[in-house]
A protein has these predicted regions:
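Conserved GNAT acetyl-CoA-binding A-motif
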Residues: 102-113
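Acetyl-CoA-dependent GNAT
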Residues: 7-79, 83-84, 96-98, 102, ...
Length: 143
């Protein structure tokens, strides 16, 4: 299965936001964080960066997206999603390999501590947990 990659377009904003909101709603601890503020912050960040997201396509259909960028001299994978119903088919592995091919050095990411499936995925692909990132999240790194 071959994936192709391109920059996101404005018309994909709602789909990317839906994935981000699903993740926040599932794993965020709303006892510590105001839900509407958390979702508003996600919306602002994604709207600002939409054209920096990479869309993965299979046979012309968008199957996932990621946002890889430099933060204070460190490469971070800030968002990474395989769209339903394409999960569990090796697409995430191919997408992460694409991210790794674009970086000379370490990739950092934050993941919700409760997102056991994602943590396992990242560990299988060479990431390790480096510590807490705050707000119920963990830092992970792959060199």
């Amino acid at each position: 299965m071959e994936l192709s990659y391109r920059r996101a377009q404005l018309l994909e904003l709602s789909r990317i936001l839906a994935q981000c909101f699903e993740n926040v709603n599932r794993y965020e601890d709303f006892a510590r964080v105001d839900r509407s503020e958390a979702l508003s912050a996600v919306r602002r960040r994604v709207q600002k960066q939409i054209f920096n997201f990479t869309i993965a396509e299979k046979d012309g259909e968008a199957v996932g997206c990621y946002f890889l960028h430099n933060v204070n001299g460190r490469v971070e994978l800030e968002e990474f999603y395989v769209f339903d119903p394409h999960r569990g088919r090796g697409i995430g592995t191919q997408m992460l390999r694409d991210c790794q091919s674009k970086v000379n050095g370490a990739i950092w990411l934050r993941v919700y501590a409760g997102n056991v499936r994602a943590i396992g995925f990242y560990i299988r692909l060479g990431f390790h947990i480096c510590g807490e990132a705050g707000n119920g999240m963990l830092w992970m790194q792959c060199i």
